[in-house]
A protein has these predicted regions:
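Flexible, acidic/Gly-rich N-terminal and inter-domain linker regions that tether
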Residues: 1-85
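Conserved Radical SAM active-site core
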Residues: 56, 68-93, 103-130
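Short pre-active-site segment immediately N-terminal to redox-active cysteine/selenocysteine motifs
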Residues: 97-101
Length: 130
């Protein structure tokens, strides 16, 4: 059975071994995840293809570029996995999976190994909401 999601560049036929080796440092730190549909949208002849830049890791991700929490979500965390920034809404982070990990994602920190912000036990978050 074909995998629903691809989580390794080894699974992407259009990326040669040399490029995979160059991108290994990036994928060792920041996860890769995509699906066949997203990959089918890429013009593999164009290294600057917008979908490619969205999905395929880039060595530039390793350059110092700012904060892993650019919107200061930590300031609004009220319980493990629960953010309450706006009066009428709360956000529960209950999954560390995403359909495709966009390279610019402002929640990129959630997909780094050892990230602990996503909480599988939502009881404290539900208590806060109640």
């Amino acid at each position: 059975m074909k995998p629903k999601y691809l989580v390794s560049l080894e699974q992407v036929a259009n990326i040669d071994a040399k490029e995979r080796a160059e991108l290994k440092r990036v994928t060792d730190l920041f996860a890769f995840r995509s699906n066949d549909y997203y990959l089918s949208l890429i013009n593999w002849e164009d290294l600057k293809d917008p979908i490619r830049r969205l999905i395929i890791p880039n060595p530039g991700e390793l350059e110092p570029w700012g904060h892993l929490d650019p919107s200061s979500e930590h300031r609004y965390t009220r319980a493990p996995g629960l953010q309450h920034k706006y009066r009428e809404t709360a956000l529960m982070l209950v999954s560390d999976a995403c359909g495709g990990l966009c390279r610019y994602c402002f929640r990129k920190r959630l997909f780094i190994k050892d990230a602990r912000e996503v909480n599988k036990d939502v009881s404290k978050g539900l208590d806060y909401i109640r």
